[in-house]
Amino acid sequence: LLSYYFPPEDQSRLMGLCAAMNQIGGVIATLIAGVLAKVGWNYAFLVYSMGLFVLVLVLLFLPNERLDAPKGSGGFIHNLKRFYPSVLGMLLLMICFFIFPTNFSAVCVKTTNLDPIAVTVIMVALDVVAALVGVVFGGMMRLFRLSVKYFAPIFFLLGYLCFATSPSLPSLLVGCLFIGIANGIGVPYLNTIASIKAGQDAATTVMPLLSAALYAGQFLSPLVATPIAAKFFPDNLSGIYWIACAFSVLFLLEAFATRRFQSLPPKE
């Protein structure tokens, strides 16, 4: 809806705020679920009742627009060909990021002396970092117009290199900082670029594709990364992080190869 109601110059800031709220919501939901789980494991699922509160907000504040697909917008294949740089970028971004939550806790427990609660705090801190980055994302887009497209894959690579090379606490903290920055930049950036490229038709053309790519990446990440790590690093628990580095490089190459599409319009 942001692409429908707001001009391109406002969208980067608003997309960043949306991403920040997404991260903060994850932190809040995780904390509430943790408290409920202490009462009983099945009570943790009550966190989904927050959806009722969200439903009230939707009914009260979201506009009652009917967004029909514009004539000549094409179907699924046409839109995929048109916006594949952003769609592929979102898929790779989610594959890179979800290697972290699906492996970090298990690897830390086996390779460090950290308490499970400390590991949880570190993981929550990553979401906080991503939220803070989302808040300032609009300014970053204006300041680094030409290079911001490379930030997410580079910070993913740096973060996973920290994990892969050392299990020490400082290395883990720095790695989480880098990955939080990468996630805080990557999602709003890809949404913003696609939204600007599609204009007011974004809600019915590229945004559904980005949403599908986002969830596909989350689903595919462990299915793809874990078997590869098991094959190439069968006796190395940190091997999964080297696979994450490889996917980060692939993400960086994709950003470079599609750099013309992923560029912001020139300043007026």
Regions found by a protein language model. Name each.
Residues 1-6, 185-199:
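Intracellular juxtamembrane helix-capping segments at the cytosolic ends
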Residues 1-22:
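Cytoplasmic helix-loop-helix junction between adjacent transmembrane helices
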Residues 45-60, 239-256:
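Symmetry-related core transmembrane helices of the 12-TM Major Facilitator Superfamily/SLC fold
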Residues 83-124:
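Extracytoplasmic gate region of multi-pass secondary transporters
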Residues 133-145, 229:
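Helix-to-loop junctions at the C-terminal end of transmembrane segments
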Residues 145-190:
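C-terminal transmembrane helical hairpin of 12-TM major facilitator-type secondary transporters
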Residues 197-234:
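A late C-terminal transmembrane helix in Major Facilitator Superfamily
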